[in-house]
């Protein structure tokens, strides 16, 4: 199943602005996905920067167009750097996005993520288990893996969006993007996207970058989800497995032409 025509039309419009702006996206992400995240942003036309030292993270967050905080490989020193960057982004009105990886499993990162929410992220992106845990409705999951369907976490996402006044994305076979008042659903993608490390983390970076665009934040974030779903489908069609999927996915993002996809579907 592909994203519907309305979503793809919206995504085509947003992608033009995204590539024209090439948002400078400050990624404080986990060690496992640094390269894949940077390459995903580059393939779409953004400008990634992986600045992680506390001395540099604070001033850089103020000049970037967007900031991503991904707690996948959180340490005490990295938490200090992330907090400094978020405080700087908050003061500079730089939109920042939280990816609360495995927040329902480990207490240190759960408390850290909850503490950061007071600094008003523009967006939160997680799987169902992570969103349920962050909203205080359940604890669990299997590390980075979800034990819940995305739809089951939609009420939690809507409550969290209302509480924080932000966009919340719950990802799965169907992605749900909500600001509590409106909710958009984006089907598509391919199961191969779950057989490599980093597609969710990379999506969070693209969501962060999309928050730098003018216009309706909900539509911009939904467009980011649509781009990734379309690229995942295209890559799967010419891949034999996870090893060939990764380069095919980056190529699909680079060559993504949503208008052409709209014309042929």
UniProtKB/Swiss-Prot annotation:
Q: Which cofactors?
A: Mg(2+)
Domain of life of the native organism: Bacteria
Question: So what does this thing catalyse?
Answer: 5-(2-hydroxyethyl)-4-methylthiazole + ATP = 4-methyl-5-(2-phosphooxyethyl)-thiazole + ADP + H(+)
Keywords tagged on the record: ATP-binding, Kinase, Magnesium, Metal-binding, Nucleotide-binding, Thiamine biosynthesis, Transferase
EC class (word): transferase
GO MF entry, a single one: magnesium ion binding
EC identifiers of the protein: 2.7.1.50
Which sites bind substrate? 50, 198
Residues the entry annotates as binding ATP? 125, 171
Record-linked Pfam families: HK
InterPro entries the UniProt entry points to: Hyethyz_kinase, Ribokinase-like
Gene Ontology biological process terms in this record: thiamine biosynthetic process; thiamine diphosphate biosynthetic process
Pathway listed for it is: Cofactor biosynthesis; thiamine diphosphate biosynthesis; 4-methyl-5-(2-phosphoethyl)-thiazole from 5-(2-hydroxyethyl)-4-methylthiazole: step 1/1
Q: Which HAMAP family match?
A: Thz_kinase
- Which protein family is named in the record? Belongs to the Thz kinase family.
What task does this protein carry out?
Answer: Catalyzes the phosphorylation of the hydroxyl group of 4-methyl-5-beta-hydroxyethylthiazole (THZ).
> What NCBIfam families does the record point to?
PRK09355.1, thiM
Q: What is this protein called?
A: Hydroxyethylthiazole kinase
Organism listed in the record: Salmonella paratyphi A (strain AKU_12601)
Q: What is the lineage of its organism?
A: Bacteria, Pseudomonadati, Pseudomonadota, Gammaproteobacteria, Enterobacterales
* Recorded name of the encoding gene: thiM
């Amino acid at each position: 199943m592909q994203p519907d025509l309305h979503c793809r039309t919206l995504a085509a419009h947003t992608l033009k602005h995204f590539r024209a702006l090439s948002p400078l996206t400050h990624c404080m992400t986990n060690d496992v996905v640094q390269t894949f995240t940077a390459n995903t942003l580059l393939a779409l036309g953004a400008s990634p920067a992986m600045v992680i030292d506390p001395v540099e993270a604070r001033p850089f967050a103020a000049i970037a167009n967007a900031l991503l905080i991904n707690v996948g490989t959180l340490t005490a020193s990295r938490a200090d750097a992330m907090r400094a960057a978020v405080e700087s982004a908050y003061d500079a009105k730089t939109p920042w996005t939280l990816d609360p990886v495995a927040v329902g499993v480990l207490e240190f990162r759960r408390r850290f993520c909850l503490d950061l929410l007071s600094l008003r992220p523009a967006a939160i992106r997680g799987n169902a288990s992570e969103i349920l845990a962050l909203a205080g409705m359940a604890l669990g999951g299997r590390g980075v893996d979800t034990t819940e369907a995305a739809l089951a976490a939609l009420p939690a996402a809507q409550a969290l969006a209302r509480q924080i006044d932000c966009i919340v994305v719950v990802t799965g076979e169907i992605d749900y993007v909500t600001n509590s008042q409106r909710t958009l659903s984006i089907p598509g993608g391919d199961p191969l996207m779950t057989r490599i490390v980093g597609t969710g983390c990379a999506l969070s970076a693209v969501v962060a970058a999309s928050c730098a665009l003018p216009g309706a934040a909900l539509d911009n974030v939904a467009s980011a989800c649509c781009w990734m779903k379309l690229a995942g489908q295209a890559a799967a069609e010419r891949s034999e497995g996870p090893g060939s999927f990764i380069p095919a996915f980056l190529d699909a993002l680079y060559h993504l032409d949503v208008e052409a996809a709209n014309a042929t579907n």
